[in-house]
Amino acid sequence: MPEPSFNLAWVDEARLADAIDQANREQRPLYLIVLATKPCYIKLASLVLACEAVRLPFLLVDSGQHYDPVLTQAREELGYEHLLAVSFGIRGTLLGRTAQLALAIEKLDAQLKAGGLRQSAVPLVSGDTATAAMFAQFWYLAHGARSVHIEAGLRSYGPDRGAWTNLQDLAEQRQLRWQRFCEEPFPEGVCTTLASVVGDLLLAPVERNVEHLLREGYPLPQLRQVGSLSSDAVRLALPRAARSPLFSLYPELAQGHWLRVDLHRRENMTAQALQAVLQGLGRLAIDGVQVVLVRTNALDGALVQHQLAGLLDEVRLKGVVVQPMWPHYTDVIHFLTSGHCLALYTDSGGLQEEATVLGVPCLTCRLSTDRPETVLDAQSNLLLPPLSAAFVHRHLRDVLTRPVAEAWPGLQRGRTLYGQAVGQGIAELLKVYEAPAVLAGAQAQYLPRVPE
């Protein structure tokens, strides 16, 4: 049976050779900084730039899990695309991409060996993507070597499911008993756990994340609370955001105050959830609230899948402004800081963090959140799950017509929740990090049985 084959999409041979030479010369690990999805392109910017500034030996590896230019342009926008060394170019379904990822890692490993690498190669995986989970797993299987997991310890919490129907005031959720939801969101809730299982150094954004990892049995010396790279990304984007053409592209957004809505999580791509949110938004627009719905690839696909494409026309007729995905990350930051953003209604983890850093009211369209600190500690966020159109409409109307401080009393406090200069701090940690020895027996080779 022939061996499966896969070719890397692109390799900067000179950058690869230079990084190997530096790691060998300095007798330091060669860090493989792994990009995967839109949040990675945004959040990892400051870390990549910091690693370059302190002259760490590293290779920037793009798996290709996201490849649409609208999703990946932050590499160029935030000033580090020139540092990209390897592109895997994986494509297809979740399982198909995972299979290709294994083959691509094998190809990269072969190139590192052919280039003469004598030091450990240590993956830096980020967040809760399938790439983060499986890159770390596959590297461990190949070498018996552990990874560094950035944004470790994210776990989803929320109120008991039965509590929502009796909730009169959305802010009362902070007084309810919250519990863990292990498989939410799908598949990210499991992916982030898998990424840490084969990690050696686990870098957690906030104290709650450290506590989650300790409860799961990870030893304290493996853990560091470092803040969130979202904080850096916002500050990196702010000077560029002033030049955003967003209001030239969409001049109506420069008038009034808008609820910005976006959805992409799989659990919100059901017919029931889509109808609840979109019909609820339509009713809100009839009430006179300005609503802009930013379409995502996931939303467009789900509307077609469930034969609900007509819902967009319905909500347009009721006054909801529907727009394609905004071209740049800096467009989002420009809008959030413009004075025209009333609040966010999103299922994005990154936007929950960015809204907290910027002091923008946030509502999360989920039954649980892997950023519970934004609701319970910073109090800059509230969960508003898509239970029904009436539920979404009633609570959006109520919370958006109240004084901001009643629903979001911690908007100013939240600005410091995720720290500052996080990428620089991580780069300084990596300068002195000693990678553990590979496991004994990990490189054992077995001869195939030859039929007699």
Regions found by a protein language model. Give the residues of each.
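Short internal beta-strands
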Residues: P57-Q65, L203, Q290-N297
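Catalytic binding pocket for nucleotide-activated donors in carbohydrate/polymer assembly enzymes
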Residues: L351, V357-V404
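A nucleotide-sugar donor-handling region in carbohydrate enzymes
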Residues: P2-I20, S63-P69, A195-A273
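C-terminal amphipathic helix plus adjacent low-complexity
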Residues: P2-L8, E13, R28, T401-E452
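N-terminal subdomain of nucleotide-sugar transferases
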Residues: P2-S63
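Donor-nucleotide binding loops and adjacent catalytic segments primarily
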Residues: A74, A242-H340
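A donor-sugar binding/catalytic signature common to diverse glycosyltransferases
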Residues: V125, A133, H149-I150, Y157-P159, ...
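Active-site and donor-binding regions of nucleotide-sugar-utilizing enzymes
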Residues: W10, I33-L35, Y41-E52, A74, ...
